[in-house]
Amino acid sequence: MSPDQEPAPRSTDPGKPAAARPLRAHARRNREKLIAAARAAFTAADDGAPLEGIAREAGVGIGTLYRHFPTREALVEAVYAAELEAVTADVTALLDELPPERALRAWMERYARFVATKRAMVNTLHSGWASGRITAPATRERITAAIGSLLAAGARTGALRGDVEADDVTAMLLGVFLSTAAEGDPSRTGRLLDLVVDALRTPVPSP
């Protein structure tokens, strides 16, 4: 067995598929390294990056890559899922570190990066959307839930308005990203995100 090979999982239940069981630690590390290498490759180029190069960058053989991800689509979808999980999980940590209004702005920046890197994978992601393996409504629900947590925290402190629907903010952000997609100008995206946050602040009472 070569260093990058993973032992085939053994089942004590012949009726249970091997893929349904948790990965062993070595296999899990290899999977994480492959996703990290693929994320870097897709961000730097596009989802046409050679799989052999991704495996080499991850420090594993091409056979290991195909054991985890039988198709390019499976790898792209895994990168998408990992990044979506990361961007939605950031909310708790940001609220622990920053006031809600600043946490919201920082999270928007991370979400903008998430959206920007997906442009390089969009052709392959289309097949996932078409097949139902990736659902746009589910993605939007998770993003909206993250925004809702940030808005609720801001409303509790009085820093952010309490009369705004989280899904309306999701729509605003998608509008920002769509309007700036062709420009590739992060500074303009940042200015527009500042305007969104300003619109969400609790109005200062008139004297």
Regions found by a protein language model. Give the residues of each.
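Short hydrophobic/aromatic patch on the recognition helix
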Residues: G59-F69
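Alpha-helical DNA-contacting segments of helix-turn-helix folds
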Residues: V76-E83
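A secondary-structure capping/hinge motif
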Residues: E73-L75, A120
